[in-house]
A protein has these predicted regions:
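Short S/T/G/P-rich N-terminal loop/turn motif that feeds into the first structured element of a domain
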Residues: 1-53, 60-74, 83-130
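Conserved acyl-CoA
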Residues: 80
């Protein structure tokens, strides 16, 4: 297996929206699980205060990430309108095609750090670690 493509997006929530975010994210998880069979992992995490969340995605390649963005486009738009205050950082690990780089820069927006580490230095991926 080639090195995976890993995406970590960190977002500040609108005040008092953690419970609504959890409900919305549960719906998103169902959509991703049903419509993205190539996705290796898709998980969300919140800080203890419930003011910031991070979404961690592991894809087999950038094509999978681009497909993901098409699948969840409307959900992302809705989340920004009603739940997210702002994106605070985007981290990408793995090869990033030019089209994917443009997509990430658009997603990051102006002033949001887009951190890209494209050069693998080693590791492994277990697909059946259960």
């Amino acid at each position: 297996m080639a090195e995976p493509f890993i995406f970590v997006g960190t977002h500040r929530l609108q005040e008092g929206k953690i419970a609504e975010f959890e409900e919305s994210f549960a719906d998103l998880v169902r959509v991703v699980e049903e419509n993205e069979p190539r996705m290796i992992a898709f998980n969300g995490y919140a800080n203890e205060e419930g003011t910031e969340v991070a979404v961690v995605q592991v894809h087999p390649d950038t094509d999978s990430m681009q497909h993901h963005m098409q699948v969840v486009r409307q959900h992302i738009t809705d989340a920004y309108a009603s739940l997210l205050e702002e994106t605070t950082s985007i981290q990408v690990f793995g090869h990033l095609s030019e089209a994917a780089r443009e997509m990430m820069q658009q997603l990051a927006g102006s002033g949001v750090p887009l951190i890209v580490k494209p050069v693998p230095v080693g590791g492994f991926t277990r697909s059946d670690a259960g």
